[in-house]
């Protein structure tokens, strides 16, 4: 039939476990032969599927130094950052709640710089130099940590992390009990 097209769905890549080596090691620069447009689609598809506001390639098992994030959550505007690099941190810090797709249900109060300057390459390979503030800066730094082989659990004390893990376990148990009651 004319006018009809078959659209091949993009498969959803599974999230890797936080203990996977790909999440612990700093990532090298992006591969020269990387298909940036295809990776952009893959990241957006996975980020939307998992209902995240940011997603690094290594979270779905792709060993490339790249992440995608919402630059404006309300407008659903995204940016994709290849080979990101923070060039200067501001002195002011702010504490905000953070969660992570690879740590479901875990929320931590994390202190980070409120402002910074960074460089990254866009999907077309163009250098972007920007300043980020507020929530946009928070998301960028969180995803940047993944590129560096670390995560938000390393930014709080062991005591606070253990308390948050207990809270998350209690919430999961409560959630399971409420499902069983139905």
Predicted regions and their residues:
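Positively charged
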Residues: 1-182
